[in-house]
UniProtKB/Swiss-Prot annotation:
Signal peptide: none annotated. Its cofactor is pyridoxal 5'-phosphate. It catalyses: (1S,2R)-1-C-(indol-3-yl)glycerol 3-phosphate + L-serine = D-glyceraldehyde 3-phosphate + L-tryptophan + H2O. It holds the Pfam family PALP. Keywords: Amino-acid biosynthesis, Aromatic amino acid biosynthesis, Lyase, Pyridoxal phosphate, Tryptophan biosynthesis. Pathway: Amino-acid biosynthesis; L-tryptophan biosynthesis; L-tryptophan from chorismate: step 5/5. It comes from Clostridium botulinum (strain Alaska E43 / Type E3). The modification N6-(pyridoxal phosphate)lysine is found at residue 96. GO terms for cellular component: cytoplasm. GO terms for molecular function: tryptophan synthase activity. This is Tryptophan synthase beta chain. The gene is trpB. InterPro entries: Trp_synth_b_CS, Trp_synth_beta, Trp_synth_beta/beta-like, TrpB-like_PALP, TrpB-like_PALP_sf.
Length: 405
């Protein structure tokens, strides 16, 4: 595979990344998603759209976000140097706003009046509510009851921003069910609404759109790292639930001699229902309108999943990630709850940066890998900040003293 031409070849015109991707939709929804795909290909490549998105990123989002060298954390581990791409400093505190502003701008150009989406940890919901307020659009966010309880600050933010938060009370009451609920609502309202998927998954064109809007993260990081150090990192890593921050981080490095590692949540362990590590334990399947690797129960349905990180507990992964693993270009590893929480507290104490629990999975892998490497450099996408998590963390883990004995 020549990765210098990869972006021109994938996805193909049908939204396929090799055997993954596509659009598996009801007859009712096919024209709605075709409308979005056609609009994306025409509107989003226009000079007017690109110019406006650049202005928004600079003036509203505060981009570019910096790359930061974790000197104290690196020193505590050894000689390998850990760097962070600080998406926690993007407006609203996570990478999610990168694609939400793009989707909101697209909706505005298309003449839609409402944004509909699901959210897990609440960061996508907050980002989309922010985009809706910015563009003067209505916003409807579907969120599982379990996540509403865990992520109360983000629920409050969404409501302050004017969004309607719809509690989802069926099934496990988490991210997968929230997607189901949002899909149902969109099916009834697609003529005046746009569905804004929260990750690099779903029916075509969303894996493509979200990847393209998020790629600003990797392009910035690549240039910034080279400017800081004079070379490329040895390893690039990011957490993977659906895979939006990872897709944005990885794409610009595909053609470079860099190891690229996605980190999935192992949760409490290997037993089905105790983790959300789709790539490690899943198999090919179709869910939520796209084909990828997914966790299945004994009946072939989406399996119950768990992660301490609400934004990672999804039983599948974006189709491009499945394809990149198949090509052998990106490897995928797992980190459990305990390892993620140790990284959460150590980054907080050593660097004064409180990370999102989702991002802590990638930091945990970087810490583990740094011990093995002994030298060189690792660049981590710190996808978000941990403000949303602190009440939950203190209730279940205290203030982290156990990690510093």
């Amino acid at each position: 595979m020549d990765f210098r031409t990869y972006l021109k070849r994938y996805p193909d015109k049908n939204g396929r990344f090799g055997q993954y991707g596509g659009a598996y939709l009801t007859n009712e929804l096919i024209p709605a998603f075709e409308e979005i795909a056609d609009a994306y290909q025409t509107i989003c490549h226009s000079s007017q759209f690109i110019s406006e998105l650049r202005r928004i990123r600079k003036e509203f989002q505060g981009r570019p976000t910096p790359v930061y060298h974790c000197e104290r954390l690196s020193r505590a581990i050894g000689n390998c140097q850990i760097y962070l791409k600080r998406e926690d400093l993007n407006h609203t505190g996570a990478h999610k706003l990168n694609h939400c502003m793009g989707e909101g701008l697209l909706a505005k150009f298309m003449g839609k009046k409402r944004l509909i989406a699901e959210t897990g940890a609440g960061q996508h919901g907050v980002a989309l509510a922010t985009a809706a307020a910015f563009f003067g659009l209505e916003c409807e966010i579907h969120m599982g009851e379990v996540d509403i309880a865990k992520q109360a600050p983000n629920v409050t933010r969404m409501k302050i921003l004017g969004a309607k938060v719809v509690p989802v009370t069926h099934g496990l009451k988490t991210l997968k069910e929230a997607v189901d609920s949002a899909f149902d609502s969109y099916a009834k309202n697609y003529k005046d609404s746009i569905y804004c998927i929260g990750s690099a998954l779903g029916p075509h064109p969303f894996p493509l759109m979200v990847r393209d809007f998020q790629a600003v993260v990797g392009y910035e990081a690549k240039d910034q790292f080279k400017e800081m150090t004079g070379f490329l990192p040895d390893v690039v890593t990011a957490c993977v639930g659906g895979g939006s921050n990872a897709a944005g981080m990885f794409i610009p490095f595909l053609e470079e001699p860099v190891d690229i590692i996605g980190i999935e949540p192992l949760g409490r362990g290997e037993k089905l229902g105790d983790h959300a590590a789709s790539m490690k334990y899943g198999e090919k399947g179709v869910m939520h309108g796209f084909e990828s690797i997914m966790l299945k129960d004994k009946n072939g349905n989406p399996a119950p999943v768990y992660s301490i990180a609400s934004g990672l507990d999804y039983p599948s992964v974006g189709p491009e990630h499945a394809f990149l693993r198949e090509l052998g270009r990106v490897d995928y590893k797992v980190i459990n709850d305990e390892e993620a929480m140790e990284a959460f507290f150590k980054l907080s104490r050593y660097e004064g940066i409180i990370p999102a629990i989702e991002s802590s999975h990638a930091v945990a892998y970087a810490m583990k890998k740094a011990k093995e490497m002994k030298q060189g450099s690792i660049l981590v996408c710190l996808s978000g900040r941990g403000d949303k998590d602190i009440d939950y963390v203190v209730e279940h883990y205290g203030y982290g003293e156990q990690y510093f004995k």
